[in-house]
């Protein structure tokens, strides 16, 4: 199996777009980012479908060779400065003095500024497990705190 596959690597290398830039594209101010996002999402009915499909296929490629052994996939755990480097990301990320302890991990998922982005991650994981059939994918929640 796989002890830890980091979802943010799949997002960074394959998806390349901040999920909130697909949820709220009108907030992306950079023309270059808008153009690049339009190219990546061309052919999709909704820009968010690009995120879900690309992320699901990337995770499925990780899970396939190890099936039926467990593949632990950690939900995204970008720090704000890392998320800002994704296409369209600057519009959605605050400047933090110390991103290592800032808005990341589990606390990001339920916050109003990322809840819709987290829903896209969940849709991708559901597709991998229920539609593609890789039930060997096990979800890990990062950076839980009280």
State what each model feature region is.
Residues 1-146:
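Conserved alpha/beta-domain cores
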